[in-house]
Amino acid sequence: APKVIVVGAGPAGLFCAQRLLEHGVRPVVLERGKRVEERAEDVKRFSETGVLDPSTNIQFGEGGAGAFSDGKLNTQTNSPLNRDVLETFVRFGAPQEVGYLGKPHVGSDNLKKVVANMREYILSQGGEFRFSTALTDLKIQDGKLRSFTAGGQEEGCDALVLAVGHSARDTFE
């Protein structure tokens, strides 16, 4: 099977990893921040002390920037994939009504549980997560990706999906 790297453990990265598993690919998910449970502690510390950890905070870490939002799910597209996304949220612990309400609301407490459940499922199917591991370089040769560097280590890969959030602009620099 090909070695596929997914960069980012927000919604796009988690759904990508799950879809890869459905096609027999065991993804390696790189995330610059921490697991959602650890992020909650960091966010609480920030709100109490004002001390910001630049790599794991309300913007960075498993679950993405929305992990600490109110959990409202809005879309302005009328895609048939919307139902699949909502059913996936329910399968991993969101309230049943998320699957049929016009304006679904997972809730911030439920959202953290859903994210953790998605991670555990991906791990149980042979996926891998590397937290506190930022992508720092890509090696492209003859127009083809040859390797990536993350956590100070260079590794080969067959494909890499950038599923970084809006705050990870430095990844593109």
Which sequence ranges carry the predicted segments?
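Residues forming the flavin
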Residues: 1-173
